[in-house]
């Protein structure tokens, strides 16, 4: 019988974090799940050593990307991600899963394959790419690092462009 995995999710209360937590909680014999916030460095109060896996979904998204927010994007999406990953590694966590973004490929990448070049067209995408590169360098035999680069994420209650797309789509004749 497989041992129960102890999972820590950063980004408590976020759309993705909440949905991952709810899904994992459907399997109480397989996963013990906790989530933590990252606002005001709340995550730094957590002892990571009691967890097997950290799923990092914390970050800035769904706000207008403007030059005056550049430093904030890099501080949260790059620097905090690197700090959380480093803390997980130093605490003996076995696996780190980072929710990156398809935006690391730019706006016109088409279908993503292993042949795509990373070419972010915004500092949102660049901040995610820079985090990806640093945390991947921490990957080794005792600490598995995985970056997931999803396109748009949607579902019941989601934010972002999907609700707007649905709204306009309902008005189109079919």
Q: Model segments located where?
A:
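NAD(P)H-binding glycine-rich loop region in Rossmannoid oxidoreductase-like domains
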Residues: 44-79, 83, 87-90, 105-107
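Adenosine-cofactor binding site in Rossmann-like domains, unifying the SAM/SAH pocket
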Residues: 32-46
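N-terminal Rossmann NAD(P)H-binding glycine-rich loop of SDR-like oxidoreductase domains
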Residues: 7-26
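Conserved Rossmann-fold NAD(P)-dependent oxidoreductase catalytic core, especially the SDR/UDP-sugar
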Residues: 82-123, 138, 146
């Amino acid at each position: 019988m497989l041992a129960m995995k102890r999972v820590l999710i950063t980004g408590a209360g976020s759309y993705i974090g909440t949905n991952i937590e709810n899904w994992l909680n459907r399997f109480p014999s397989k996963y013990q799940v906790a989530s933590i916030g990252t606002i005001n460095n709340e995550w730094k109060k957590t002892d990571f050593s009691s967890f097997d896996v950290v799923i990092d979904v914390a970050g800035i998204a769904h706000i207008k990307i403007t030059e005056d927010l550049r430093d904030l994007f890099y501080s949260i999406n790059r620097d905090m991600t690197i700090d959380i990953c480093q803390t997980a590694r130093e605490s003996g966590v076995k696996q780190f899963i980072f929710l990156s973004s398809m935006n690391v490929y730019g706006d016109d990448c088409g279908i993503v394959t292993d042949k795509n070049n990373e070419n972010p067209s915004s500092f949102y995408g660049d901040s995610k790419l820079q985090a990806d590169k640093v945390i991947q360098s921490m990957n080794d035999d005792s600490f598995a690092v995985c970056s997931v680069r999803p396109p748009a994420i949607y579902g019941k209650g989601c934010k972002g462009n999907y609700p707007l797309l649905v709204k306009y789509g309902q008005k189109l004749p079919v």
